[in-house]
Structures are given as C-alpha cells and as structure tokens.
Amino acid sequence: MPQKTLFFAFFFISLLSFGQEETLFNIVRTQTESDDSLLPDRMVFTQSLLWGEKGVMRKTGWYPLNLELREKELKLRRSMLKLHQIIGYATLAGMITQGVLGTKLYNGEGRLYDTHRMIGDITSISYFTGASLSLFAPPPLTNKKQKGLNSIKAHKYLATLHFSAMVATNVLAGKSTRLHRAAAFTAFGSYATAIIVFKF
C-alpha cells in the first residue's frame, strides 16, 4: 500500500509539472535576435550526433537548421521529455515491484522466478526507452554551464549511476545473485533519488 501511495504521489507531481507551458516561439525568436546560432554551444554527444550542425537529421535533410524547423524541434523535445517523464514513473513502479518480488525470491519463494523475470524484462525495456527519449531529444535553446550543484546537475549525475547500475543488473541476471541484487538496489535507489531531486 505505501508503494502505491508513493507511485501515485510521483505521478501527481508529474501531472502538475505538465501545466507549466512555455511559449517556444517567443523564446526562439528572442534568442535568435540576440544570437545568430540556433543551437546551444554545449550538447550531449547523442544530441550532437543527431541534431548538431553536421548531425544525421541535418545531413539527411529531414530537419535543416532554420528558425521554423528549430521551433518544431523544440516542440518535439518537449513531447519527448514529457514521454520520458511518464515512462520514468512507469519504470519506477516496475522497479518497486521488482524489489518486492526479488526479495521474496531471494528468501526462497522460487515460484516467483518467472514473474520476476518477466517484470524485469518489461522494466528494462521501459527504462532504456525512457533513457533514449532523453538522450536523443533535440537540444535545448541554451545549455550554459552553471556553477555549483543544482537539481538538473544532480539528476544527470544520478542518471549516470542508475544507467550503469541498470546495465550491470541485466548483465548479472542469472550469473551472481548477490551482485545482481546489489546492482538492482543501486539502480532503484539512484533512480528514485534522481526523480525526487528533479522535482524539488
């Protein structure tokens, strides 16, 4: 019951954050009036690969770099990050379920193995789908380096940790119960913390 309450609390907070809409057209136009560049100076490698000046989207001609299409990219970014957020809560629910099932399995309830494995596969698919949405979304307008620790930086640092832990959890499944369990709890702890720090 507390797990359901926790999940619904996270989901409700997420819904509230969707109401904070920005006027993308005004932001883009204001930015381009003062800056000739339509792209930020700093981008994640995956964003640069797809959306950089010489990225795949530019070379294929699907998204030439111009003001009109940059506005569409920012709308696409917003949609991808909203979906990333929704999938993130579904993944968190899967991780909580896995924690309960995994603990029971660890304590000798072998009949739960197939269920644990199936939910583990679903949770992994949702996790890596959500991660891809974030990593491959078009870049923001600006990405200036900020001094000190803030919620976005903390979210990114924790993302590095839970991504590594999720890879380890999948690699260690069926190989080392003790290490698999440690990786899974590390993934859950850092993932849940990443959601919390991003909201507050």
Where are these predicted regions, by residue range?
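Juxtamembrane helix-capping/reentrant segments at transmembrane boundaries
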Residues: 146-154
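Serine/threonine-rich low-complexity intrinsically disordered regions
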Residues: 2-3, 23, 150, 176
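Bacterial Sec-dependent N-terminal signal peptides
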Residues: 1-22
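Hydrophobic alpha-helical membrane-anchor/signal-helix detector
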Residues: 77-106, 115-138, 153-174, 180-200
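N-terminal targeting leaders of membrane proteins
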Residues: 17-114, 130-146
